[in-house]
């Protein structure tokens, strides 16, 4: 989370949605300061913000979850930065890599798993993420798919004149551009059940090649119920982790400067 008192804006950084690149640029160019944790949510900000800060312009990035699932798989498969094998990042040590993350990582590594095998094993419930706890509190939402244009528009709406383009950073190693190379016919129906409710809620579409799709009623109901439970858990039961990120990370270095 990045706050700028100069321009009176708050950026809520969501995982796998260019939060590092945007946070760094807001810090370097627009007086942005780290606030709480990298992926803190709006209700956490509300608990500590001043009355004037609650009036700040709020924005975040929304990304197609089909893309996010592929990105997560490729990051685990490559483990380029060693995140999934670094004990300092494990949740029991105050980090963000949970036991579930490590279970998925080990499954991919031990079985040389394809995306389709991984998806069948770990994606069984309707997909949801922190966007559902964030977007309703935003004054503007950047779509990841049009991030270059939307980023500039967000800054203009926040009162920045002549904002600079966002540098491209943090591309996922090994990731292919064609979604259909991942979402093959053998996981098409599962994908519709898993992603359908989220895509419909945020006006995303399945690949055109799939034609007209029907989202199962069971998935729609599960998505609604699990969404309510998720909000209650995040707001009232989830333990807050350390506000300080690791030294050597983009957010951690900003916090220490």
Question: For each of these PLM feature ranges, what is it?
Answer:
Residues 1-257:
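Membrane-interface amphipathic segments in extracytoplasmic regions
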